[in-house]
Amino acid sequence: MIVPMSEQIDSTLVDVAVVGAGPAGAAAAIHAARAGYDTLLIDSSPFPRDKTCGDGLTPRALHQLDLLGVEVNATYRNRGLKLHGFGGTVTAPWPATYPSREGTALPRYEFDALLVAVARDAGARLLTGTATTPVLEGNRLVSFDVDKQRVTAQWVIVADGVRSTFGKQLGRTWHRDEVYGIAARAYAASPHDGEEWMHSHVELKDPDGVVQPGYGWIFPLGQHVNIGLGALSTATRPAHLNTKKALHFYAEQQRSEWGLGELRNVTSAMLPMGGAVSGVAGANWMLIGDAAACVNPLNGEGIDYGLETAAMAVEMLGTKDVTLAWPDRLHAEYGEAFLLARTAARLLTYPQFLPLAGPVAMRGPVGRMLMPAAARLMGNLITDEDRDLVARAWRLAGGAVSALRRDTPLWDA
């Protein structure tokens, strides 16, 4: 049979194909190209392009960027978090866990484009198009199509975000009986766009005055602010919240204090969290970052995990078969912490829990003790190098939760 010229597909053969050019995918392409692999980076949209995100870069994320040699030329810097709600305010500076005790924030349309440019400078090629039609032999990915290109790669790293449409075609399953997030985000002008603290409001109410299991945020960006909110949900206890409408209501509550202008670029998203997906690897392919639900269940933060899993995945290249090795690696790095965070987040989905626990946590000596630690957990800043009481409690509690909930979905093969 003769195939018409308009339907002919070109073939591309590479060592490593990376599907998705967000922070995780671009970082993977940087690592792979610098390691000497012929690397193809694929994204469905031309750059720059926007993504629903809080835009915050914690000291943990900045540490990963330092390891990559990527300099974020953001003039804005912040010192940590301020948490508000239930009649109290707690200030939580970034701890001295990483070399820098400063964070920053950069809109995703700038940050992603920066990382893609670094990947191209490292030698990765960029292809714009949608990855579809994977051809599998057993659990080995032989080839897939990107528009009229057929891509054959020795290794494939899938970093196509929270929806992970290509990951789904490979068998990725999202377990919505575990905690997931729903969120909305916008930008607004503010005379306080240089404020040196990121602000979170943990007493998030809907227009009817009902406390929701989530929080609102205002993250200064130096030229404007990122304002958003997120709520926690499960299949059995869904958050009955229209996030975009709730965001406008939240903005009205904060407008006077922050001098907020009109909201622009309002977007929303749903977030699988805490490793609550299965089917994250095959013989020669791995899901990383948001696609692998590497998202903190307490706040929806995922950039630092995306950067870390990118480096980890490239380290695994050359392994004979990563079907089990990759989820095992994710378990080892994040398993106990994610199980504990998912358990804590699940508590917040019970309507009666937050109104009772919130005032205790945010006021008085208990709040001064607990909430800086909670802020650190929300900033993904617990590591094995920590030696203080909170870090030890985190690891001990993580071990206990792990023992109690071993059957819970956590990157199951």
Where are these regions (language model features)?
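A short, basic/flexible loop-to-alpha-helix module at the beginning of a structural domain
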Residues: 2-13, 290
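N-terminal Rossmann-like FAD-binding beta1-loop-alpha1 element of flavoenzymes
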Residues: 14-40
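Conserved Rossmann-like nucleotide-cofactor binding loop
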Residues: 24, 47, 163
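Glycine-rich FAD pyrophosphate-binding loop
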Residues: 33-53
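A conserved beta-strand/loop capping segment in the N-terminal third of enzymes
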Residues: 62-114
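Predominantly flavin-linked oxidoreductase catalytic cores and closely associated redox partners
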Residues: 118-258
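FAD/FMN-dependent oxidoreductases across multiple families
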Residues: 233-316, 321-325
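C-terminal helical "tail/cap" subdomain of flavin- and related membrane-associated enzymes
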Residues: 315-413
